[in-house]
Amino acid sequence: MTRQSHYQAIILDLGNVVFEWDTSQNPPTAAPNQISLLRTSMKSPVYHSYERGQLSTEECHRLLGESLHVDPGQIKEAFDLARQSLRSNPALLDFIRQLKQTRGVAVYAMSNIPQAEIEYLKESRAGDMEVFDEVFASGYVGSRKPETEFYRRVMGEIGLKAERVVFVDDKEENVDVARGLGLYGVCFGGVEELRGHLLGI
């Protein structure tokens, strides 16, 4: 039997919420500078364009290489490393499945993620990704968080009033935009903290 909730849908971020990067599990050949290069790359305007679907993977690697003065092959190696270190958050996934079953809520993913990476996740993590009723990736939408257009596009697709939707993200700036649009925003601080939020509303 399902219990009626005040909210009808949950929007979850993927990175650092549903999935985490566990660099302790990287192969022994992984150098610290690869991890540093990855972090620097992901903060770059070039990578943000890649996340919006404005660049191909090859173009992204080439332009990042030019801007960071490294060989594009090193950029590719850094991103391959990120894929290898990706781990799901089983406690969160179990809780979300429980919510879907007991409260009948819809669950969506909304993530700043390039087309190639979301397709990789759908293929390599199919069992985890099936928890979502729909996945909204910046690479296909053409905008990224915290850009308001991304939120409006997602809410238009969901078709619910903002106050009936919970938005969960690990970045406060993204949560602030959601709150400004009327959603119930939660900055992710762990599964138990999220459980307290969602079971209390």
Curated annotation (Swiss-Prot):
Reaction(s) this enzyme catalyzes, per UniProt: (S,S)-drim-8-en-11-yl diphosphate + H2O = (S,S)-drim-8-en-11-yl phosphate + phosphate + H(+)
SUPFAM superfamilies xref list: HAD-like
GO biological process: one example: terpenoid biosynthetic process
GO MF annotation, one: phosphatase activity
Protein origin, superkingdom: Eukaryota
Keywords: Hydrolase
Protein induction: Expression is regulated by the secondary metabolite regulator cclA.
InterPro entries on file: HAD-like_sf, HAD-SF_hydro_IA, HAD_sf, PGP-like_dom2
Top enzyme category: hydrolase
Pfam families attached to this UniProt entry: Hydrolase
Pathway: Secondary metabolite biosynthesis; terpenoid biosynthesis
NCBIfam families for the chain: HAD-SF-IA-v3 (TIGR01509)
Family: Belongs to the HAD-like hydrolase superfamily.
Task performed by this protein: Sesquiterpene phosphatase; part of the gene cluster that mediates the biosynthesis of astellolides, drimane-type sesquiterpene esters that show antimicrobial, anti-inflammatory, and anti-tumor activities. The first step in astellolide biosynthesis is performed by the sesquiterpene cyclase astC that catalyzes the formation of drimanyl pyrophosphate from farnesyl pyrophosphate. Drimanyl pyrophosphate is then dephosphorylated by the sesquiterpene phosphatase astI to produce drimanyl monophosphate which is further dephosphorylated to drim-8-ene-11-ol by atsK.
Protein's name according to its UniProt entry: Sesquiterpene phosphatase astI
Source organism (scientific name): Aspergillus oryzae (strain ATCC 42149 / RIB 40)
